[in-house]
UniProtKB/Swiss-Prot annotation:
Component of a multi-subunit COQ enzyme complex, composed of at least COQ3, COQ4, COQ5, COQ6, COQ7 and COQ9. It is an enzyme of class 4 (lyase). It is found in: Mitochondrion inner membrane. Lyase that catalyzes the C1-decarboxylation of 4-hydroxy-3-methoxy-5-(all-trans-decaprenyl)benzoic acid into 2-methoxy-6-(all-trans-decaprenyl)phenol during ubiquinone biosynthesis. Its cofactor is Zn(2+). This is Ubiquinone biosynthesis protein COQ4 homolog, mitochondrial. Residues 1-30 form a transit peptide. GO terms for molecular function: 4-hydroxy-3-methoxy-5-polyprenylbenzoate decarboxylase activity; carboxy-lyase activity. It is a peripheral membrane protein. The keyword Signal does not apply. It comes from Mus musculus (Mouse). Belongs to the COQ4 family. One of its GO terms (cellular component) is mitochondrial matrix. GO terms for biological process: ubiquinone biosynthetic process.
């Protein structure tokens, strides 16, 4: 309850300021050096406010893992040092550095759905579109970054959110609870973000016994192995690889095919 009250007060405080909201997705960049609002949805917070938000968001996310707003708040208020490490990894990689420079966004306003639909069967773009259709999800459900007090790091965590469904596609995981837990294990190994580690450790609490057996005996070892073997997935410019066969991209990244029986579990 305290977290929700704090969120509401921060939103109210922000709403009293003049604001210009972009009509479409734009790269996250600072408007000027020294400006307190560093990007369009930025809400400056003190260390104490971040601590309170993190504690409350963690509790809410554990109680209801589908509260994506609370998961987002938890990620932004606990991952500063990890985000710096991920940012530095991107800067050292040519493809990652290009992403940081160009700041691409993944949303319905930036995706050419008709082009994706026209791509060959088995291509990354076609399989990503199939994932969205089958699981009835939209890239527009990703919350904007608000509580990261650095515009470059804000983009890094925004990029992580927007490629989350791409990781589902790469790993062949559905959006049920079991699939989400498996992806969280992969992300935890890949990124080290506290919210990913928390989701990986506590997500299994809500799974059935049959799913738990498969998770611990097969899926967690598979996710950890792939997470360690693959290069940083934030360094992949997915939008420039739509035509690449999904199997070829998996092979390039060292990601082995997903277990066949995952779809029947929840």
């Amino acid at each position: 309850m305290a977290t929700l009250l704090l969120l509401r007060s921060l939103r109210l405080h922000r709403s009293l300021r003049p604001r210009t909201r972009p009509a479409v997705d734009v790269p996250l960049r600072a408007g000027s050096h020294g400006a307190r609002l560093l990007y369009p949805d930025h809400i400056p917070t003190t260390p104490l406010q971040k601590m309170l938000l993190a504690a409350g968001a963690a509790g809410m996310a554990l109680y209801n893992p589908y509260r994506h707003d609370m998961v987002a708040v938890l990620g932004e208020t606990t991952g500063c040092h990890t985000l710096k490490f991920l940012r530095d990894q991107m800067k050292k990689d040519p493809e990652g550095a290009q992403i940081l420079q160009e700041r691409p966004r993944i949303s319905l306003s930036t995706l050419d759905l008709s082009k994706l639909q026209s791509l060959p069967e088995g291509s990354l773009g076609r399989e990503y579109l199939r994932f969205l259709d089958v699981n009835k999800v939209s890239p527009d459900t990703r919350a904007p970054t608000r509580f990261v007090d650095d515009e470059e790091l804000a983009y890094v965590i925004q990029r992580y959110r927007e490629v989350h469904d791409m990781l589902h596609t790469l790993l062949g995981m559905p959006t049920n609870m079991l699939g989400e837990v498996v992806v969280k294990w992969f992300e935890a190994v890949q990124t080290g973000l506290p919210m990913c580690i928390l989701g990986a450790l506590f997500g299994p609490i809500r799974l059935r016994t049959q799913s738990l057996q498969v998770l611990f005996s097969e899926l967690i070892p598979w996710a950890i192995q792939n997470g360690r073997r693959a290069p940083c997935v934030l360094n992949i410019y997915y939008e420039q690889r739509w035509e690449q066969p999904l199997t070829a991209l998996r092979e390039e990244l060292g990601i082995s095919p997903p277990p066949k029986h995952i779809q029947g579990l929840a």
